[in-house]
Amino acid sequence: EFLLGKQTPYLAVSLINLAVLVAMNRWLFGVPFKGSGLTLAFGGLLYVLATTSMGLLISAFTRTQIAAILGTMIITSLPTIQFSGLIVPRSSLEGAAAVMGTLFPAGHFLDIAVGTFTKALDLRQLWPQCLALFGFFLGFTGLSLIMLKKQEA
């Protein structure tokens, strides 16, 4: 309950942001949407759950909310930008860089967003990425619960 209460406001704001960004892409920038809106929404929900759970895990190691926010930015920004496929395609990454690309949720969501927007993909093709995001959510939430129990003891 405690973790869900901390996560819910971020979840709501992030899903609203996703809807606004999709609308802007479609109507302001004229990017055609060819795939499944439900798949993009589902992938977006899983991505937000995974990333907010990662934030909860990082906050378990800090004393203040500001420290948690800064820590999350420092720990996730560079790997997300460099290895998610945002700048360099993940298919061209090798070795440790390729591993880093799979260890953060952003790359998996980027595959979902690009797949639904430009390649007309739906859940039948994007289920591995959705499963990975769900795995991140379960893993980060599970570790957060373990850390919370250790703090209470």
For each of these PLM feature ranges, what is it?
Residues E1-N17, A132:
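Alpha-helical transmembrane segments of multi-pass membrane proteins
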Residues A12, V22, P32-A153:
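Membrane-spanning alpha-helical segments of multipass transporters and channels
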Residues A19-L28:
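Short membrane-interface helical motifs at transmembrane helix boundaries
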